[in-house]
Amino acid sequence: MRRYDRIKAVVSLDAIAHNFGEMKKNIAKGTKIIAVIKADGYGHGAEAIARLIHGYSYIWGFAVATAEEALQLRAFGVTKPILILGIVFEEYFPDMVEQEIRLTVSEYSMAEKLSEEAVRQEKQYISILDLTQE
């Protein structure tokens, strides 16, 4: 019987740094980007990638899929803004407010519950952006 090795990806942080440098060349001066590093940096290591690019001036912050990923980035020492792209369950609201992690809100009731938690923690938390205005 033939033996097949598992497929694996070997990622060079130098290559990632190079790729971010190339992206920077293609964005307008003063423009900031959000680095999406969900799913453990798509399997390349969210912690290593976050540590590498955290200091880049054109990185506004990071986007992840879940509350767990966001909390993990905070535990790694990420201080820039973190946006969760997926659904966050109410049980995570206290941690999200405390850690200043941003959520996408899809229902008014969710905004109300987040607001209640922010008031409980005596923090300003909710910002509403009207993207329909030009």
Feature locations, PLM:
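Active-site-proximal beta-alpha core segment in soluble small-molecule metabolic enzymes
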Residues: 2-11, 15-18, 31-134
